[in-house]
Amino acid sequence: MNFSFSSYPYYNMIKHIANMKRFSLWFTHITFIGLFLMFQLIKDYFSSEGQALINTIFVVTCIIAILLWIIYCVFLKLRNKSH
């Protein structure tokens, strides 16, 4: 029994993410990290709840970014095997 990735429900979405240019992934993630570091410089102007919210958003976004890179690398390897 052969398993086809195309039967996976999110295959097209993941394929689209994997087809993004590597530069755009780098640019997006580095820009986000830069904005977070700038927030760290001015965090005294935010309430503790605001700081906690922004830190939580940062951690969740970092996890998503790491998952995007893993997906990108896996599909890159799969694409290279198929050629």
From Swiss-Prot:
Keywords: Cell membrane, Membrane, Transmembrane, Transmembrane helix. GO terms for cellular component: plasma membrane. It comes from the Bacteria. It is a multi-pass membrane protein. The chain crosses the membrane at residues 23-43, 56-76. It is found in: Cell membrane. Its main location: membrane. This is Uncharacterized membrane protein YoyJ.
